[in-house]
Amino acid sequence: MPTLPENWQHDWSHLSFTDLALELYSLFISSDEIPREDLKELIERSYSTFRHPEVAPLHRVGEKQWILELFHGPTFAFKDVALQFLGNLFEYFLKRRNANKVGAERESLTVVGATSGDTGRCALGF
């Protein structure tokens, strides 16, 4: 299990959503698996379609109360935060697997899911 750097609260408090995502995802995704620059590009692409520049802005509504807005993604659902990145991960690994393949050798990916409500619309982004 990864551990946070000693001064993470101070060092990461000023980061943008995408920069914070890069730091957090890097704890779980080895640079041997996805080089840091590739991971940064995946994160930036995943959240570039969000309607708010902060992706998921945090608003203070009371002395100790905050609201995190998770509806600024392409389908207005909180699930966009995870599924936009997941779709780009699928594409990244598929492109890597197909790098030197042609024609019938090339692999494809089919995602089959059953859902209701807002999840289905989010998953269509794949």
Walk through the language-model features, giving the residues of each.
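PLP-dependent amino-acid enzyme catalytic core
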Residues: 1-126
